[in-house]
C-alpha cells in the first residue's frame, strides 16, 4: 500500500509510524496505553485506508487517528495529537520559509537534521527564520543569502543558547560543501584520487603523496572518511579551518573539505611506515578527525603541500661574532619565511662598552642586534600573511639587562626600542633566593666576553651550585668590570615591563637543567617563542673557509660545525574530548600521536640544514595538551580545589608513562636516538629524580634502558591558541578568559563560548582573571614533574595587583619547580555579575 506524502511523492505504508505518533500523544498527558489499545486504533485507520483508496494521504491518516482517539474516549490525547500536528505544520512552514529565502531546495535535509538534533524550544528554526529575514535584501545572490543564514545562526548564539554555534557550523559546512561540489564538477573531479591528481597538477599538493601510494590505496583510504564528524565542529572552529587551513585554488576558492584535509595529513604522516601503512593512515585520521588530537599549526597547514615545513619551534644560540650574529639573523629569516617561530639566546654576545680586538669600550651591546632581529621579523612577513615572531633571551647577570628590560615599554629612548620582538630573561636559583630574602641586596652584571677573556670560561655554560661558585668568583675578581644594581631595582624593571607589556617571559635555568634528561650532551640556555621547549643548545661555528676550483670555476667552500639548532614538532591531546580515566584507550591514543610526531622528523621540509641535523640526532618531539579547563569542567571539578591538583597529577603521570612506553617501543622497532647512551633515560636517573618507584614504573625503566628511547625529549605544553579553537576546546592549560564573549573580526562579531557550557558547568568555568593564580601555579608545578620539557604558563592579573603581589607569583612559580612563565596578562578589573553564589 502506497501513501501520498505532502509534497506529492509516495512511500510504502508503515503502521509503526502511526503507533509511534499515538504513543507520543499519551506520553504528553503522562498516561499509559496498552499495545492492544494502540494497535486497535491502528487497525481502524488501516480499515479506513483499505476502504478509501483515493484518500491514502498523510493528512487523511492523521484525521482518522484523531477521530479514532475521540471515539475511544481519549479526548485529552486527541487534543495533544491535534497540537502535535499543528506544531509539525508550523515547523514545515518555517522550513519552507527558509528554503524559499535561500532559493536553494537542497538545504532542506540539513534543516531537518537540525530540527531533529536540536529539539529544544530555544533552538526552534522560527528564531533563525526571523533573524535571517531581517538580513535579506532583494538583490542578494544565492551565495550571499546562504552567508546571511549562517550569520543569523551565529548571532543567535548566547551563553544561554550556546548550541546555535553548532547549528551555524552545520550551515557553514553546507555552504562550503556546495562550493566544493561546484569546484569538483568544473574540474572534472569524481573521486578522491581525481582530486589529489588535480591538486598535484596544480602545484597545490606535494607530488610525494601520489608517488607513495597507489591509486587503489588512495581510494581505500578515501573510504576511511566520515563526513558525520563535520558535526563535531562549532562555528568558530570550522570558520578558522576554512579560512586558514583548507587548500584553496589560486583564485582563493576552497577545493578541499575538512575530512579530505585530515585524510591528506594522515596520508602524509603515515608515509614512512613500512608495514600496515593504511592501518596507520586510518589511526592518524581517526584521532585527528574526532578532534581528540590536534597537530600544531605548521603541520595542520603544510602537511600534504609542496613546502611541507611541519615544525613549530626553532631555537638558535647567537655566537659572539659578527659572522655568527648575521648567520643567526639569516637563520631567523629562513625560519620565519616558512612559518616557524623562533627563540634566540643572546647571552653570549658582548655587552655595550665591551672590547673588540683589544679596542676598549667600542662594543655596541645586544640592543643594536636585537633591533636588527626586530626589523627582520617585520620584513619577512610570510607572503604578507603575518610578520615573523621571535623571543630574545638574555641572562639576568648580563650587563645590558636594564636596557633590555625596556625594549617594549612606552617610555624612554625610542632608538633603544624593539616593539615587535618578545624579551625573555633567564634566572638562576640564586637570583630568586636573594629576591625572596632581601630585595636591597646588590646584584652584579657582567659582560660575557670579558668573563671569557679574563677568567677563561663562559658563565652561561654552568648551572646550579657550579654556576653560583663561578658567579661569586666573578663578583670577587677586581679585574672584571661590574654594573651593580640592587635586586629591588632590577625586579622593579622586570615587573613594570611585565604589567605594561606582558613580557619578559621567564626561564628558570637551574630548574630546567637539573631536569634535563640529556645533560650528558650539553646545556639548555633558553626556551623558544612560547616557552614550552627545553632542549640542548650550542652555537653554529665556522671551522674553515677555503677557495677551491670546481668544474673550472672558483668557489668558496665553508666548513661549518652545525651545533645544536633546536627544532621541535608539536601536537596536543585534547583532554576535553578524551576518556582520561580509560587507561587502555589513553595509552593507545598517546602511542599513535607519538608515532605521528616521530614520522614528522623524517617527512619535514627543513628551512635550514642545521635544524635537520639536530632533529635527526635528538629526534625531539613535543606532545602537549589542550582542553585542560574543559576536561575539569565536564567532570565538575573546580579549578581552585585540591581535587583539581590530584586529578591532573594522575592524568599527567599516565600521559608521561604512555609517551615514554611508546617512544621505547618505537626505539625497539626503528632504533634509538643518536645520544641515548649516557642519558638519564639510559641510566635510569630520569625515573629516580621524579620519584617514579612503583613496580610499573620500575619495569618501564628497565625496558627503556634495554630497548632505548626513540626521542630525546617528549612532552611540552604549547599555548594552542588557534588549534584549540578548531577543536572547540579551551586553550592549553589555561582557565577560560570568559564563559562567553563576542570577538570582533573583520567587521563581524564572532561568539566565543566555553565548551560544553551548561547549567552544570557554568560555575565551574570561573574567569582566568577572577581565579586565584596560586592554584594555577601549584597545578603547573605538579604537572612539571611529569613533563620533561616545559609548559606555556600564563599568569592573569588585574589592575588591583601590586608589584609585590606579582613578584610573589614569580617566587611561587620558582619554588614549585615551574620551568618557565609565558605572558603576564593584565586587565582592568571589569564589573562582573555577582558570583558569590558560586561557592
Where are these regions (language model features)?
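Polar, glycine-rich mid-to-C-terminal structural blocks
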Residues: 406, 419-494, 498-501
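Terminal amphipathic helices with adjacent charged low-complexity linkers/tails
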Residues: 80-87, 164-196, 427, 512-535, ...
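Catalytic alpha/beta core of large soluble enzyme barrels
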Residues: 214-220, 230-239, 531-535, 597, ...
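Function-dense linear segments that define catalytic or interfacial modules
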Residues: 247, 253, 261, 265-277, ...
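Core nucleic-acid recognition elements
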Residues: 9, 31, 36-263, 279-285
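Alpha-helix capping and helix-loop boundary segments enriched in small/acidic/polar residues
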Residues: 9-13, 33-36, 101-102, 140, ...
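Internal maturation/activation junctions in enzymes
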Residues: 287, 329, 589-612, 638-720, ...
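Short, surface-exposed, low-complexity cationic segments
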Residues: 14-32, 107-121, 263-270, 733-736
Amino acid at each position: 500500500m502506497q501513501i501520498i506524502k505532502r509534497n506529492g511523492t509516495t512511500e510504502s505504508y508503515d503502521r509503526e509510524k502511526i503507533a509511534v505518533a499515538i504513543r507520543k500523544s499519551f506520553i504528553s498527558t503522562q498516561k499509559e496505553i496498552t499495545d492492544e489499545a494502540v494497535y486497535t486504533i491502528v487497525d481502524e485507520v488501516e480499515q479506513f485506508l483499505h476502504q478509501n483508496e483515493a484518500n491514502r494521504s498523510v493528512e487523511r491518516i492523521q484525521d482518522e487517528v484523531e477521530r479514532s482517539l475521540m471515539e475511544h474516549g481519549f479526548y485529552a490525547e486527541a487534543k495533544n495529537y491535534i497540537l502535535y500536528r499543528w506544531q509539525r505544520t508550523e515547523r514545515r512552514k518555517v522550513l519552507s520559509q527558509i528554503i524559499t529565502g535561500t532559493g536553494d531546495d537542497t538545504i532542506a535535509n540539513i534543516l531537518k537534521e537540525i530540527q531533529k538534533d536540536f529539539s529544544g524550544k530555544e533552538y526552534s528554526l522560527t528564531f533563525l527564520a526571523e533573524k535571517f529575514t531581517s538580513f535579506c535584501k532583494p538583490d542578494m545572490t544565492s551565495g550571499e543569502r546562504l552567508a546571511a543564514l549562517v550569520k543569523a545562526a551565529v548571532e543567535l548564539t548566547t551563553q544561554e543558547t550556546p548550541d546555535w554555534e553548532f547549528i551555524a557550523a552545520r550551515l557553514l559546512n553546507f555552504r562550503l560543501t556546495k562550493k566544493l561540489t561546484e569546484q569538483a564538477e568544473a574540474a572534472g573531479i569524481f573521486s578522491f584520487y581525481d582530486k589529489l591528481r588535480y591538486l598535484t597538477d596544480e602545484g597545490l599538493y606535494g607530488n610525494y603523496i601520489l608517488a607513495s601510494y597507489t591509486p587503489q590505496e588512495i581510494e581505500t583510504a578515501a573510504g576511511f572518511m566520515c563526513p558525520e564528524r563535520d558535526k563535531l565542529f562549532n562555528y568558530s572552529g570550522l570558520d578558522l579551518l576554512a579560512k586558514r587551513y583548507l587548500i584553496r585554488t589560486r583564485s582563493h576558492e576552497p577545493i578541499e573539505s575538512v575530512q579530505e584535509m585530515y585524510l591528506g595529513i594522515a596520508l602524509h604522516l603515515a608515509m614512512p611506515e613500512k608495514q600496515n601503512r593504511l592501518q596507520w593512515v586510518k589511526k592518524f585520521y581517526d584521532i585527528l578527525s574526532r578532534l581528540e588530537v590536534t597537530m600544531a599549526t605548521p603541520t595542520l597547514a603544510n602537511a600534504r603541500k609542496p613546502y611541507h615545513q611541519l615544525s613549530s619551534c626553532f631555537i638558535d644560540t647567537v655566537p659572539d661574532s659578527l659572522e655568527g650574529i648575521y648567520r643567526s639573523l639569516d637563520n631567523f629569516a629562513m625560519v620565519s619565511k616558512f612559518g616557524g617561530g623562533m627563540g634566540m639566546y643572546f647571552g653570549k654576545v658582548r655587552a655595550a662598552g665591551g672590547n673588540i680586538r683589544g679596542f676598549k669600550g667600542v662594543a655596541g651591546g645586544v640592543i643594536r642586534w636585537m633591533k636588527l632581529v626586530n626589523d627582520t621579523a617585520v620584513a619577512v612577513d610570510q607572503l604578507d600573511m603575518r610578520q615573523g615572531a621571535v623571543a630574545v633571551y638574555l641572562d639576568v647577570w648580563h650587563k645590558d639587562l636594564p636596557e633590555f628590560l625596556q625594549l617594549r615599554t612606552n617610555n624612554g629612548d625610542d632608538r633603544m626600542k624593539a616593539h615587535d620582538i618578545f624579551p625573555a630573561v633567564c634566572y638562576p636559583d640564586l637570583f630568586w633566593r636573594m629576591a625572596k630574602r632581601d630585595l636591597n641586596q646588590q646584584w652584579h652584571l657582567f659582560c660575557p666576553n670579558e668573563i671569557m677573556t679574563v677568567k677563561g670560561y663562559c658563565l652561561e655554560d654552568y648551572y646550579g651550585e657550579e654556576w653560583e661558585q663561578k658567579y661569586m668568583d666573578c663578583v670577587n675578581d677586581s679585574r672584571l668590570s661590574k654594573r651593580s644594581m640592587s635586586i629591588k631595582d632590577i625586579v622593579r624593571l622586570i615587573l613594570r615591563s611585565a604589567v605594561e607589556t606582558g613580557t619578559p617571559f621567564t626561564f628558570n635555568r637551574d630548574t630546567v637543567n637539573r631536569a634535563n634528561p640529556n645533560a650528558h650532551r650539553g646545556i639548555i640556555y633558553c626556551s623558544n617563542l612560547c616557552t614550552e621547549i627545553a632542549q640542548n643548545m650550542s652555537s653554529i661555528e665556522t671551522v674553515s673557509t677555503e677557495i677551491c676550483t670546481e668544474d673550472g670555476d672558483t668557489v668558496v667552500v665553508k666548513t661549518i660545525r652545525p651545533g645544536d639548532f633546536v627544532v621541535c614538532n608539536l601536537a596536543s591531546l585534547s583532554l576535553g574530548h578524551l576518556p582520561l580515566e580509560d587507561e587502555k584507550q589513553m595509552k593507545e591514543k598517546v602511542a599513535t600521536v607519538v608515532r605521528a610526531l616521530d614520522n614528522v622528523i623524517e617527512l619535514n621540509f627543513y628551512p635550514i640544514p642545521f635544524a635537520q641535523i639536530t632533529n635527526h640526532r635528538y629526534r625531539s618531539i613535543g606532545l602537549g595538551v589542550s582542553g585542560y579547563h574543559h576536561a575539569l569542567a565536564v567532570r565538575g571539578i573546580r579549578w581552585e580545589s585540591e581535587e583539581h591538583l590530584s586529578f591532573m597529577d594522575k592524568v599527567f603521570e599516565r600521559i608521561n608513562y604512555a609517551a615514554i612506553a611508546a617512544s621505547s617501543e618505537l626505539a625497539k622497532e626503528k632504533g634509538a636516538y643518536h645520544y641515548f647512551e649516557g642519558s638519564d633515560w639510559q641510566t635510569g636517573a630520569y625515573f629516580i629524580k621524579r620519584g617514579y618507584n612503583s613496580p610499573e614504573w620500575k619495569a618501564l625503566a628497565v625496558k627503556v634502558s634495554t630497548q632505548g628511547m626513540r626521542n630525546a625529549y617528549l612532552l611540552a605544553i604549547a599555548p594552542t591558541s588557534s588549534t584549540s579553537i578548531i577543536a572547540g576546546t579551551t586553550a592549553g592549560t589555561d582557565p577560560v578568559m570568559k564563559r562567553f564573549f563576542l570577538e570582533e573580526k573583520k567587521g563581524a562579531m564572532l561568539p566565543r563560548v566555553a565548551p560544553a557550557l551548561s547549567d552544570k558547568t557554568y560555575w565551574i568555568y570561573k574567569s582566568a582573571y577572577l581565579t586565584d593564580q596560586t592554584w594555577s601555579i601549584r597545578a603547573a608545578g605538579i604537572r612539571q614533574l611529569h613533563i620533561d620539557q616545559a609548559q606555556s604558563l600564563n599568569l592573569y592579573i588585574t589592575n588591583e595587583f601590586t608589584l609585590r603581589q606579582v613578584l610573589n607569583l614569580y617566587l611561587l612559580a620558582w619554588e614549585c619547580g615551574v620551568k618557565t612563565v609565558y605572558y603576564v596578562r593584565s586587565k582592568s578589573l571589569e564589573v562582573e555579575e555577582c558570583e558569590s553564589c558560586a561557592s
